[in-house]
């Protein structure tokens, strides 16, 4: 009461506690997430693949109320952590001490009824990692080769990014429970980057007026023989000469790294170079460079056939046409080449006039509209993965994608 008046009453009315029809009280105060399925993720790192394959899907699953997921790089041996979970997904574990942890997890999984899923988005067996790859050293030791294979064999399921990698690991390890889930970019990260007016403005400025189109390659140093271990036989070995010959025709732009034989042109400013950006800043960096097209060369080897088409996805989201190596890696790409000369011909063809160019831009952007992570059918693939065993009839989306 306040000054003799019951709180909630007004003059001439019945106090709240005396009303004959009190407001119904909620019967279930359980938070909605309490009844959702739960799973755990163990990341390999916090670099690009950690986000593409683990962190971004985990964030989306939690944000859209599909399930409750927790992720970490810290291995936990407290058995109570694993009560009531559906599955654990482990990314690119390879060392002997990680094998010991997985052996312990295997016993917990068998006792508690959860599944172990191994995630890998690259070739990590040393015999198929190219000599020019600067990260090869991390997988050269005998114990790493043995531990990584053993862990894949021990898991109930393996997830990869493409069909070629599915066949590769199935052949190498004997584990046939391998599921392809492509790389799905978050729409909040890339979906707002398409700007048709800016694309046309960049064409008018650099192609029509200055007659020197800006051509971009954005990628890590893993594609280049930075330590000169392979006599410069890297992913640009077959296109280097045409880049050298066309520095007056195109403004070549490299982000992240560049082939060592082009170093003098980079130092002189004839080839433009920009350091790598943080992952969340990468789309803005590429957009700020005002490029007219992109390229994605690869040499044909097992390692590259197992690669995913991230460069095609990123460029298409921005509406920048990309010319990709004609390999299984880029089977979805719209413009493909085999030799360096073909790469130049493809660039000239798509840039030849504004009408043709804009058709390429729009077609590229439309080609990836079904690839957004937040698309219900894409997000539900992850839900099926974490909650249902391999080949289960209710995994309709994954079974269709993997032709099971």
Where are these regions (language model features)?
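N-terminal pre-catalytic "stem/leader" segment of glycosyltransferase-like enzymes
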Residues: 2-95
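Conserved catalytic-core segment of nucleotide-activated headgroup transferases in glycan assembly
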Residues: 42-56, 60, 183-288
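Membrane-proximal helix-turn-helix segments that form the acceptor-binding/catalytic region
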Residues: 107-108, 138-158
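A short, active-site helix/loop in glycosyltransferases that binds the activated sugar's phosphate group
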Residues: 149-178, 185-192, 259-261, 332, ...
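Acceptor-binding helix/loop patch of EC 2.4 sugar-transfer enzymes
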Residues: 118-145, 187-203, 208-211, 220-222, ...
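Nucleotide-sugar-dependent
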Residues: 126, 226-234, 280, 284-317, ...
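A charged, aromatic-enriched C-terminal amphipathic alpha-helix characteristic of glycosyltransferases
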Residues: 198, 355-396
């Amino acid at each position: 009461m306040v000054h003799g008046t019951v709180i909630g009453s007004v003059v001439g009315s019945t106090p709240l506690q005396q009303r004959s029809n009190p407001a119904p009280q909620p019967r279930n105060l359980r938070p909605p997430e309490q009844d959702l399925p739960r799973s755990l993720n163990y990341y390999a790192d916090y670099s690009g693949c950690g986000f593409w394959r683990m962190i971004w899907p985990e964030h989306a699953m939690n944000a859209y109320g599909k399930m409750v997921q927790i992720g970490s790089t810290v291995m936990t041996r407290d058995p109570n952590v694993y009560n009531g979970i559906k599955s654990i997904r482990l990314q690119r574990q390879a060392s002997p001490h990680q094998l010991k942890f997985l052996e312990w997890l295997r016993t917990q999984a068998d006792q508690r009824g959860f599944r172990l899923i191994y995630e890998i988005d690259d070739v990590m067996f040393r015999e198929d990692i190219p000599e020019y790859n600067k990260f090869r050293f991390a997988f050269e030791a005998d114990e790493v080769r043995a531990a990584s294979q053993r862990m894949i064999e021990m898991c109930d399921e393996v997830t990869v990014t493409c069909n070629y990698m599915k066949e590769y690991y199935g052949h190498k390890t004997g584990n046939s429970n391998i599921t392809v889930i492509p790389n799905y970019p978050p729409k909040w990260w890339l979906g707002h980057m398409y700007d048709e007016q800016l694309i046309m403005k960049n064409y008018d400025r650099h192609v029509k007026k200055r007659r020197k189109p800006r051509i971009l390659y954005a990628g890590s140093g893993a594609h280049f023989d930075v330590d000169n271990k392979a006599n410069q036989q890297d992913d640009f070995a077959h296109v280097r000469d045409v880049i050298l010959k066309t520095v007056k025709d195109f403004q070549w732009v490299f982000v992240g790294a560049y082939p060592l034989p082009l170093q003098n042109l980079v130092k002189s400013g004839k080839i433009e170079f920009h350091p790598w950006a943080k992952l969340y800043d990468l789309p803005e960096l590429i957009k700020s460079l005002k490029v007219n097209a992109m390229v994605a060369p690869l040499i044909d080897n097992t390692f590259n056939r197992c690669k995913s088409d991230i460069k095609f996805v990123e460029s298409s989201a921005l509406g920048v046409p990309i010319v990709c190596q004609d390999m299984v890696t880029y089977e979805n790409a719209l413009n493909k080449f085999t030799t360096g000369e073909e790469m130049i011909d493809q660039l000239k063809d798509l840039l030849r006039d504004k009408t043709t160019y804009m058709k390429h831009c729009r077609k590229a952007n439309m080609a990836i509209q079904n690839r957004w992570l937040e698309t219900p059918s894409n997000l539900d693939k992850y839900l099926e993965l974490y909650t249902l065993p391999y080949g289960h009839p209710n995994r309709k989306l994954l079974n269709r994608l993997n032709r099971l």
